[in-house]
């Protein structure tokens, strides 16, 4: 039924993964959570404790392959047709987060849940990224549905696995977020329906000013 796919890089994911597991168990469906670490230098000692959990597959890569390739690897290894992509630097503040996606399982549609940011200001060095996220990325579903393909992001995304037989994340793209833009264009070309719903997760991993400027 559901494969939850989380690429990890230098972020502690134990709490959010266990929350996802608890929500999936309440749905009473077959599920798996694939957590693939992209050769991180931090938090592996903590994250590896997920290996003992049922329905969770935690794997550490020997070499860093980048978020595009690791997403494609997660798709390849997923065993169910409903794929839920989540970034690792998140928190979930909705007890019905997975249940809100359930009506779209096996729909054949791509569904974007959206992103939110904490209301409290972060440290000064991260304030630019936070303001950008609050002003440019945090949009409700009605606004995103006005231009569904332009608003596409794989940060919080439900998609049927068979779509990836036609389209994959482009591994030649190295710019920040541009692989999502290109994937959205390909979805439009293939006539795949992209729907946006109000089911956001909170983005925690804010880059410092200089790093964010270099990425964009």
List each model region and its residues.
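Short aromatic/hydrophobic "clamp" motif used to bind/position activated sugar donors
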Residues: 83
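Short, well-formed alpha-helical segments that are part of the catalytic scaffolds
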Residues: 10-25
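Short, flexible, basic/aromatic active-site loop/helix in glycosyltransferases
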Residues: 114, 130-149
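A recurrent flexible, glycine/aromatic-enriched loop bordering the glycosyltransferase active site
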Residues: 140-159, 174-176
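Acidic donor-binding loop at a coil-to-helix junction in glycosyltransferase catalytic cores
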Residues: 176-183
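Glycine-rich, basic loop-to-helix element that forms the pyrophosphate-binding segment
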Residues: 61-78
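A conserved acidic beta->alpha catalytic loop
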Residues: 35-46, 90-91
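Conserved donor NDP-sugar-binding/catalytic core segment of glycosyltransferases
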Residues: 95-126
